[in-house]
């Protein structure tokens, strides 16, 4: 892992979290308890802060960044799939962001939502709570079922277990 100060600000990373080799975390980044940041992920808090809350997993090759005056906030119990990009946006609690998705500046993903693989959420779009969105640009498909909500939680639980198995 590579942790870098930016303009005198060092990332704040909980000792209960796991940052994997080749991940890069720079600047005004706060990572809470039991967060996993997997191989080759990059998290940059150089233009505004990045906050990632507990039990969240940032999978391989993700990019988390900000824009001037636009922070990035990722809530509790979130799965950010491989190679997803979250740029100056908010992801509320209990969400799954599919592989290769792109969440752009000012967008908000409401809690308990699922952004399908490869989906592009345009700037300033609001995804309502408990919603499935897919496509480029995103389209709201429907409310999530109870089974889908359980699967989001199971995915988060799986990554917590997986993180604990690495030394």
Where are the model-predicted features located?
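A positional/architectural concept
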Residues: 8, 12-66
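Active-site cofactor/substrate anionic-group-binding motifs, chiefly glycine-
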Residues: 50, 71-72
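Short beta->alpha connector loops at strand-helix junctions that form conserved
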Residues: 66-68, 144
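Glycine-rich hexapeptide-repeat left-handed beta-helix
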Residues: 1-12, 46, 54, 60-61, ...
